[in-house]
Amino acid sequence: MNGKFSKSASIIVFLLMILVLFGCSNQPSVTEDGRPILNGIMVKHALTKGFDEMEWLQEAEERAGVEIKWEEVSADWDQKKGAMLAGGDIPDIIVGANVITNADFAQFPGLFDDMTELIEEHAPNVQKMFDDRPEMRIIATQLDGQILGLPKYQRYWPETSTRQFINKTWLDELGLEIPTTWDELFDVLKAFKEEDANGNGNTNDEIPFDFSPVGTGGFGFFQPSVLLGSTGMTISGGGGQGYFVEDGEVKNFFIDERYKEVVSFLNELWKEGLINSEAFTQDYTKYQSTARGSGNEAKVGYTFGWELSDRFGTEVADQYVSIPPLKMTENSDIDVSWTYDYNQLNYGENMVQIASQSEHKEELMAFINELYDPVVSMQVLFGSIGPNIEENGDGTYSVLPPQDESMDPGTWKWTSTWADNGPLYIDDSLELELGEDMKSVGAQTEPLLPAFESVDPLRDVYPGLFIKYSQEDNNTLSLNNTDMMNLAMSNFSLWVTDGGIEQGWDSFVEQLKNMGLDENLEIMQGYYDDYINQLDE
């Protein structure tokens, strides 16, 4: 009897387990209104609010006939990505600014879907983007012709990320004019240091010149590499790893005599105590906070930044003005230039991907097509119509100030929406009045605009974003650049602070060449020539 009971109990338990498993495997896969429920990952800014609070996103999913369960990631993405890709278990859709890279596509072939046919059949907005801006198709297309990730274009950002600011109040207090040459800048900075420019009775608390911390991987925004523009050189991205284009030739400024002149000038400033003594040791937070002064008392005379209120805060920003690029000397007949960053600021690659194993690719492409509608893209970038954007009733729109008056517009944007991390296309036909912060950036860029008049962005700037290297060439470039930057950036800080560039120059150039610089230039020249030929077809 006990044996029969035990056997019956075992059968009942087994059947219950089957029912539980059956129930678990049949969780709702569609919404009540019949939309498939899909899985997605979005790598977002840490400030960005939950996606269920974004009106534009909920509306886009409904119009596309899907519901996406988003995993919102703002930290440790590289670690998560490595395990996810290696295991081959990816969600239906992944969104984020190049969070899946061309190298990932090469390393994990077949994991992501080729969207070419889906775009032709289900994404008229994406197709229009490709037709209107052929460079967008170039960015999206891999060497084998597949489209595995889609790009973005956000249109409104200026030609450069870096503006140079000087304290006009200090100049007026000392009876000085805005400098126009390196020599004049030297004299102004010396006066800032020695003549109590902020008028507080302490001649030792002014910082004549400060720039953003320089890393080991190359130059970036808000750094003194922009002074290369005084020599007529057009760099991009603040200089990066030194590559630039001049008269159709790919070059590297780390072996260019003009770079030596800039470093020598910076060394002269350093020797006179005119550069912040912490310039090479501070972090970016310190760089920003120092420029904001103390109350209405400014601390920094001349520096670089994105926008006045962003750089200096609300208390001292009105003391500063944006100024044009400097000439090397008064008699110089060189056409000055500046760092051209429009491509880095407005374009982005691999913003969204679809998993090849997804069973709902057409629905996913319908959703992606929604994102590339200009009115939706506007909301991806700046936030929803209503709280973030006003619809004016005549086909035009206006970005609204933050609802939280204590929050600056930039923070409000990143809090409200996907912002620069989202797939989007701001069509030239969209009529949108920008917020005050972007208007200010535009106005503060105006002194620099003449420097770009002779620059052909398609031919005079290395088109790194529009080029797909083979895996072999990419590996070669990466390995060579790592070695070269370790040497070049350590020498930059050494030569600015201790001098010695004249004595060490020839040996330095030879070392860079031995590390593979000539090989890199040859590779990049080939890709640049192919790109130009493609433009001319």
Which residues are covered by each model-predicted region?
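Sec-dependent N-terminal signal peptides of Gram-positive bacterial secreted proteins and lipoproteins
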Residues: K4-Q27
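Extracytoplasmic/secretory soluble proteins
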Residues: G3, C24-E537
